[in-house]
């Protein structure tokens, strides 16, 4: 007797706001369906505007970039992830896509230069409430 498997596609998104889901779906052609959480529109920033984006924001914050671009974000008030992997609750955490996998932050700014589609998906979807994309 032949086994006929049933394929289920899990595309309901319970993590990100409608705005983040719409952005990711549009940019990466990902089949994601929001559950109705409303938030801010996705922002586009220059590197100089990153500090202002995070100012006054509550919750965990992160800048996510490819490993080779992390030094661009070594500034006052930003905390580059150390080997111990400790996340700062007060500063802006700076980390690679790989380091961000499985984590969630209230606000995320992504410097997506050189990222693959998969890396962009991981980076963008770390943001629970607010996402910004850093472009030059």
For each feature predicted by the language model, list its residue ranges.
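Conserved helicase motor core of SF1/SF2 NTP-dependent helicases
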Residues: 1-136
């Amino acid at each position: 007797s032949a086994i006929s498997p049933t394929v289920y596609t899990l595309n309901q998104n319970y993590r990100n706001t409608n705005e983040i889901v719409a952005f990711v779906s549009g940019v990466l052609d990902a089949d994601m369906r929001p559950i109705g959480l409303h938030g801010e529109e996705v922002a586009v920033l220059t590197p100089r505007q990153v500090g202002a984006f995070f100012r006054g924001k509550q919750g965990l914050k992160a800048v996510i970039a490819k490993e080779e671009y992390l030094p661009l974000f070594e500034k006052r008030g930003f905390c580059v992830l150390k080997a111990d992997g400790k996340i700062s609750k007060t500063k802006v955490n700076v980390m690679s896509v790989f380091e961000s996998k499985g984590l969630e932050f209230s606000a995320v700014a992504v410097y997506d230069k050189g990222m693959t589609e998969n890396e962009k998906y991981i980076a963008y979807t770390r943001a629970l409430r607010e996402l910004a994309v850093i472009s030059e």
